[in-house]
């Protein structure tokens, strides 16, 4: 848990009236601002602050959405034969829509190279 503090008393005069974020899980303190001796965002062990007195400062913490990695899946429900037929006879399939990179696109609007690529990537013999 993160707690905001203002140091009100310390043997180290550089710490007096400085503001810190204390992380109780890692036992570390991050300097928010100090008159001297510490730079903004400097991280030190809480024990390095020595004997201090402080007052807690209310924090307004907004939840963060973290996306770490992830995968994307496009699902096209049709057969290889249908796509190959659409390549040969585009007039018969004017409304054929597929998913490519998260977007819906008309198959006939793709270049021949893109159409071949879609067929190759959609229908594989093994993973």
Swiss-Prot record:
Lineage top rank: taxon: Bacteria
PROSITE patterns cross-referenced by the UniProt entry: GLY_RADICAL_1, GLY_RADICAL_2
Keyword Ligase: no
Cellular component, GO annotation: cytosol
Signal peptide residues on this chain, from the entry's feature table: none
Keyword Disulfide bond belongs to the record: no
Keyword entries, A-Z: Organic radical
Modified residues (Glycine radical): 102
Stretches assigned to the Glycine radical domain: 5-127
Xref: InterPro entries: Auton_GlycylRad_Cofactor, Form_AcTrfase_GR_CS, Gly_radical, Glycyl_radical_cofactor_GrcA
Pfam families tied to this protein: Gly_radical (PF01228)
A GO term, aspect molecular function: formate C-acetyltransferase activity
Purpose of the protein: Acts as a radical domain for damaged PFL and possibly other radical proteins.
PANTHER family associated with the record: FORMATE ACETYLTRANSFERASE, FORMATE ACETYLTRANSFERASE 1
Name of the molecule in the record: Autonomous glycyl radical cofactor
Taxonomic lineage of the native organism: Bacteria, Pseudomonadati, Pseudomonadota, Gammaproteobacteria, Enterobacterales
């Amino acid at each position: 848990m993160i707690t905001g503090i203002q140091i009100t008393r310390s043997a180290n005069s550089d710490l007096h009236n400085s503001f810190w974020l204390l992380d109780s899980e890692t036992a570390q303190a991050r300097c928010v601002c100090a008159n001297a001796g510490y730079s903004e965002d400097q991280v030190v062990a809480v024990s390095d602050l020595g004997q201090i007195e402080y007052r807690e400062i209310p924090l307004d913490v907004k939840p963060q959405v973290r996306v770490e990695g992830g995968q994307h899946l496009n699902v096209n429900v049709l057969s290889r034969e249908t796509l190959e037929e659409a390549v040969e006879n585009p007039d018969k399939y004017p409304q054929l829509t597929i998913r490519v990179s998260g977007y819906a696109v008309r198959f006939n609007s793709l270049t021949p190279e893109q159409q071949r690529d879609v067929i190759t990537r959609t229908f594989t013999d093994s993973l």
